[in-house]
């Protein structure tokens, strides 16, 4: 029977801690919650190779400890279907990764993990291994996002001197979109895309021990978005140092 105090049963871990304290035994520290790992999917509704990667990404977004961001590129728009979520900004970001990884060019589908490793987006084994490896690393920056009410939030970034000069990015994304494809390589298919990034912009650079930003989960036109992510990253699409995510819808 578990010992009681004031007539209430005490949790076994508390009893163990009290026993250890009385006996002078030190217990191992509680495991820290792993820092979020940023997983970016570069995809297009006009790419016939992308649906399997989109499906894998749909599984990844449900993983704990993952900040999943779906970037739709624009370089497949010319073959018949204009991806409504595509942006030149997202293509440019992928091109920066291509230079960082010393690739000869860009391709879809591609998944980039923590800004350090790029894999074919439909290669489940390689992608999952990259995520598992990234989760083992200690973050160099932490991001806490507090909901203030409605679509207003506040992000607080904390880091040491090693993060000085890092870029701080804001992503606004929608949880899910289902689209009937009328032309192009995926003509006749109905595609589902999740964590679709709608806006990507720089908030500033990290210059000290702490940085705060008041955010609105909407674009300049007032279109609201379901999710907000803040990413701390070395310049020119370098390694990601830390990230945080929050949902308003």
Residue ranges with predicted function:
Residues 13-25:
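Bacterial N-terminal signal peptides
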Residues 28-29, 245:
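Short, low-complexity polar/charged micro-motifs in intrinsically disordered terminal tails
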Residues 6, 22, 30-32:
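Glycine/alanine-rich phosphate-binding loops at beta-alpha junctions
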Residues 8, 27-28, 118:
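A subset of signal/propeptide-processing and intrinsically disordered low-complexity segments
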Residues 84-110, 116-249:
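Short, conserved sequence motifs used for protein processing/export or organelle targeting and
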Residues 2-16:
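Bacterial N-terminal signal peptides that target proteins for export
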């Amino acid at each position: 029977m578990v010992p009681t105090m004031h007539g209430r049963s005490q949790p076994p871990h508390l009893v163990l801690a009290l026993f250890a304290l009385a006996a002078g035994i030190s217990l191992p520290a509680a495991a820290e919650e792993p820092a979020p790992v940023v997983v970016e999917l570069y995809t297009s509704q006009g790419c016939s190779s992308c649906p399997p990667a989109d499906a894998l990404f749909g599984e990844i977004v449900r993983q704990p400890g993952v900040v999943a961001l779906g970037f739709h590129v624009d370089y497949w728009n010319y073959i018949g279907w204009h991806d409504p979520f595509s942006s030149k900004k997202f293509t440019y970001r992928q091109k920066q990764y291509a230079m960082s990884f010393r690739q000869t060019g860009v391709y879809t589908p591609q998944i980039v993990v923590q800004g350090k490793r790029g894999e074919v987006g439909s290669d489940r084994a390689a992608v999952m291994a990259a995520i598992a490896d990234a989760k083992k690393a200690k973050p160099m920056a932490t991001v806490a996002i507090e909901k203030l009410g409605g679509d207003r939030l506040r992000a607080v970034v904390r880091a040491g001197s090693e993060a000085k000069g890092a870029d701080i990015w804001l992503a606004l994304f929608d949880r899910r979109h289902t689209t009937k494809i009328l032309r192009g390589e995926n003509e006749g298919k109905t595609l589902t895309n999740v964590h679709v990034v709608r806006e990507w912009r720089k908030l500033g650079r990290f210059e000290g021990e702490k940085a705060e930003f008041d955010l609105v989960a909407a674009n300049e036109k007032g279109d609201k978005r379901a999710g907000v992510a803040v990413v701390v990253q070395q310049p020119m699409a370098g390694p990601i140092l830390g990230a945080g995510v929050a949902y308003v819808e």
